[in-house]
């Protein structure tokens, strides 16, 4: 998508982002997402906007994700815009339904919904 001309913006929503790093050191979905976006930006520079939305009902989890990303990807503002949210997935999805139905055809929205944790 980063090289497709008909797409101007990509929004990626992780509605159960968790802590970002598992107790065994494995990386969770928000960290893997940032890694993937950085890799794509490094190999295929583009002016397309990539927006990441990381949400969890546990505020401490969201803070841990934010801290990890800021420490390990201090240049993240150069390759994406990250919004951190704290709330229930159900409420977030309700809020987004009306808004996303009005987005431009050049904007693509992806949702990662996994309440039980990402496993590779």
Where are these regions (language model features)?
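SAM cofactor-binding core of SAM-dependent methyltransferases
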Residues: 1-95
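Active-site segment flanking the S-adenosylmethionine/decSAM binding pocket
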Residues: 82-120
